[in-house]
Amino acid sequence: MKITLQQNKWHGEEPVDIFLPDDWDVMHETMLCDKKEPLDYKAIREKIENPIGCEPLSEMAKGKKRVCILFDDMSRPTPTQAIAEPILDILLESGVKKENIIFIAALGNHGPLTREDFVKKLGEEIVSEYFVYNHVSYDNLVKVGTAKRGFDVMVNKEVMECDLRIGIGAMIPHAANGFSGGYKIIFPGVAGIDTMTQIHSYAGQTMTEEMKKGKFSFPMGKLLDQGMRFEIEECGKMVGNLFKIDCFVNTKSEVIEIFAGDPIEEYYEAAKVCKEQYEIEKPEKVDVVIVNSNFKSNESNVSYGVALQCFMGEDNRNGDIVLVNFAKAGQVPHFMIGHFGRTTKARLNTSLPDFRLEGKSIYYSPYGDKSGMDEIGIAPDRYIWAKTWNEVMEALSKHGAGTKALVIDEGAIVSFKE
């Protein structure tokens, strides 16, 4: 059985074929997002100019002196250029001067992008004709308020100096927030690391307490009643004057839907239909989970965490995981939760819970990345690096006829049906 997986996002877009034995019981479900046609320039522009909860961007832009356009980094699948182009046309037609428009990569607490990365996100023309900068979460911040829990809310100084802020992002299931989108382009996108330490640690504490009580529900694709989302909205309101554009994408990273407008109102409208775009069935019992890590190849802990969910049930605690990742770039430096040595970890570093009693974690990639295993959260005694698919199948050789296997087309966006 041959299955084609989309791979090499931002690195050539070359798919990867995998081959499974014909006598295996393979579950491979196509997500709804892959059954829809992508939007063209005209459709994207129409969505932007018919927003939810606020006036059209063309009206908001009138009389504005400085405009910043925020976009996410290489750990997100957002096809930024396709959305940035109609935005720029709207701004220029509304009288905003070209030299007064800047782009800022909303990196959160990730490492900086290079010019080459900017071009992959925005295209050669935009990078050549507009100022494009990286956010730094440690410096050049201003206080915009104090949160209810008492911590300072710090945001990028340049962002706050602009009188119109536009955010471009993708709305997909998120491992700690239910869904990405909305004000997340600000928090953590262009926020200070101390502010985000408060917000992330509060959410992490809530999830840890749920796990201890045996009530843990993996948040991807769920609007759970927990602190992170609410605090992001609370802090976001302090920033103000943000026009947000969130897109749905298919597994080829093409825009299939747009929600735009007020960051809170468009977020909840999008959330109503987001989960169904990306959900698949989770088998009650499975022997092998093959999860593709393409969109967030440099944050493969997300896809790995999705695979681990399949082994959380009391009756399914044994099985192997294959993580497919062909990205040359490796794992993104994460200054809040990353690893910076064998004993040196970032301030909120934690590890994914692996409830399996037995089972290997096979990292299928032409590019060895031993330190990356720390970032992904694979325990050393489970880790196998396979450079070829033949090596993967050798590592899975104990599995014979009737093996139940689940293949996940894109671990970064999938959520399981309830």
Residue map of PLM features:
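Glycine-rich phosphate/diphosphate-binding loops that line cofactor/substrate pockets in enzymes
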Residues: I52-C68, E93-K98, I280-V288, E314-R317, ...
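C-terminal non-catalytic interaction/assembly regions of soluble proteins
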Residues: L92, G305-E418
